[in-house]
Amino acid sequence: MIRKLDDFDIKILDLLQHDATATMAELSEKTGLSANACWRRIRLLEADGVIKNRVTLLDPQKIGLGITVFVCIRCAEHSQDWLDNFLQIVNESPEVIEFYRLAGDIDYLLKLQVASISEYDRLYKKLVSRVKLTDVSAIFSMEELKHSTILPLPETSDKAERKV
């Protein structure tokens, strides 16, 4: 079920998407709610699964993981056992940072963050040796032009004016 967000929820989410380290005092000042009201709303948003997690975003380049690889996978097999095996391999591979099942010509898309081509090759060999795949192709990113973790939120009314 999708939670109905009011203007204050949207304002809090907007602020936290930009800075998850914002204090209750800062959130209170920017929303016009008390710090306690902000805290209660955040707890409800977490309990309802609207806020999934609060994380620190790292710069892959600065920690030696400067190669982004998109792996396009086609397969002939689609059974639950096959998918369970595939998921297990993906879940035990920390290089895989995103994983999607797609509609269209490609069945699955993986996004990897690796330090080197040889690290990608090691993962590729592990994958093809343990999962029956029809086709695997890799696309190496030359440059990241946009990356955002901020989701678009509905506009708020005047009650909780956005001040980011």
Curated annotation (Swiss-Prot):
- Classification via Pfam families: AsnC_trans_reg (PF01037), HTH_24 (PF13412)
Its GO CC terms?
Answer: cytosol
Q: Does the keyword DNA-binding apply?
A: yes
Task: Give the PROSITE patterns listed for this entry.
Answer: HTH_ASNC_1, HTH_ASNC_2
Identify the Gene3D superfamilies for this entry: 3.30.70.920, Winged helix-like DNA-binding domain superfamily/Winged helix DNA-binding domain
A GO molecular function held by the record: sequence-specific DNA binding
Looking at the record, the residues that make up the HTH asnC-type domain are 5-66
Extract one GO BP annotation from the record: response to amino acid
Look up the DNA-binding region in the UniProt entry and give its residue ranges.
24-43
Record keywords: DNA-binding, Repressor, Transcription, Transcription regulation
PANTHER family in the cross-refs = DNA-BINDING TRANSCRIPTIONAL ACTIVATOR DECR, LEUCINE-RESPONSIVE REGULATORY PROTEIN
Q: What does this protein do?
A: Represses the secondary, H(+)-coupled glutamate uptake system (Gluemp) genes.
| Name recorded for this polypeptide | Glutamate uptake regulatory protein
Give the species this sequence originates from: Zymomonas mobilis subsp. mobilis (strain ATCC 10988 / DSM 424 / LMG 404 / NCIMB 8938 / NRRL B-806 / ZM1)
